[in-house]
UniProtKB/Swiss-Prot annotation:
Pfam families: Choline_kinase (PF01633). Belongs to the peptidase S49 family. This is Protein LicA. The lineage of its organism: Bacteria, Pseudomonadati, Pseudomonadota, Gammaproteobacteria, Pasteurellales. Mediates phase variation of the LPS epitopes. Phase variation of H.influenza LPS epitopes expressed by LicA is determined by a translational switch. Lipopolysaccharide (LPS) is a glycolipid that is a necessary component and antigenic determinant of the outer membrane and has been shown to be an important factor in the host-parasite interaction in a number of Gram-negative species. One of its GO terms (molecular function) is ethanolamine kinase activity. It comes from Haemophilus influenzae (strain ATCC 51907 / DSM 11121 / KW20 / Rd).
Length: 267
């Protein structure tokens, strides 16, 4: 969605070349990405990446033959979600030593500093003051949480299935975070039905043996908070990108609408 990707054939071996645009250099810490990307590959969660330049963000990835990104339809199926949970469990319980923490609120501050026309955020809707106030109320949401290695951008396009093996790709936003953040992302980005979302959370909790009944209810609330905060962040992210001439159609509006809908459901 933010990079130019080119399929290359080098001596009979296929690779995907990623060329980031100029705006991305301000939005992404490529040193963190390169470090985390390598760890994920060594753990068998990521595809082979022979080149990832920490300064330019140029990346060369081995092309996986007979592979496909997951669709929203697939991600609403229990068999597929079970496989996703297996990868999440491996990631969140890995011995990775990610050097960075991914915070929605720190990212928001960075993006907002890059937004030249600040009113593009506050004048987007008459309810923005309320939305902003509630958003910042959740800044301490992870204060008592043990942060674990997370992908933080598990859109369907970043989950690649080759035969029966699932890969998580594009680790640009990876870092330490609440594991529920990854689950919230999948629910939001794949537009999971209530049944599928419940199955995803229950399967994850059963596999990790992490939550008893009360904690499970709290987890449901945290998921809504994470989803709300994600929509606010990606709305702002879109406004920054649009200032630099990129066209995202009604993507920003959809993000904002989703945030307001979740705002009404928040505890």
């Amino acid at each position: 969605m933010t990079n130019q990707n080119v399929l290359l054939n080098i001596s009979g071996v296929k690779f995907v070349l990623r060329i980031p645009n100029a705006v991305n250099l301000s939005l992404i810490n490529r040193e963190y990405e390169a470090f985390n990307n390598a760890q994920a590959y060594r753990a068998g969660l990521n595809v082979e990446t022979p080149v990832l330049d920490a300064k330019s963000g140029v990346k060369l990835t081995r092309y996986l033959e007979n592979s496909n990104t997951l669709s929203q339809i697939q991600l609403n199926e229990q068999s597929c979600l079970s496989q996703v949970v297996n990868n999440l469990y491996r990631l969140h319980n890995s011995e990775f030593v990610f050097r960075n923490v991914f915070s929605v609120f720190d990212e928001f501050r960075q993006y907002f500093s890059l937004l030249e026309n600040k009113s593009a955020f506050y004048q987007a809707d008459s309810r923005m003051d309320k939305l902003s106030a509630v958003f910042w109320q959740f800044e301490e949401i992870n204060k008592e949480v043990i942060l674990r290695p997370c992908h933080n951008d598990l859109v369907p396009e970043n989950m690649l299935l080759q035969d029966d093996r699932l890969f998580f790709i594009d680790w640009e936003y990876s870092g330490l975070n609440d594991p529920l953040f990854d689950i919230a992302t999948i629910i939001e980005e794949a537009h999971l039905s209530k049944e599928a979302a419940d199955f995803l959370l229950e399967t994850y909790c059963n596999q990790t043996n992490k939550y008893h009944k009360t904690e499970f209810q709290i987890a449901h609330k945290r998921l809504k908070i994470h989803r709300f905060c994600q929509n606010v962040l990606w709305f702002l992210w879109t406004k920054v990108k649009e200032e630099h001439g990129e066209n995202f159609g009604d993507y920003a509006l959809k993000r904002l609408d989703a945030a307001f809908k979740l705002l009404e459901e928040l505890p």
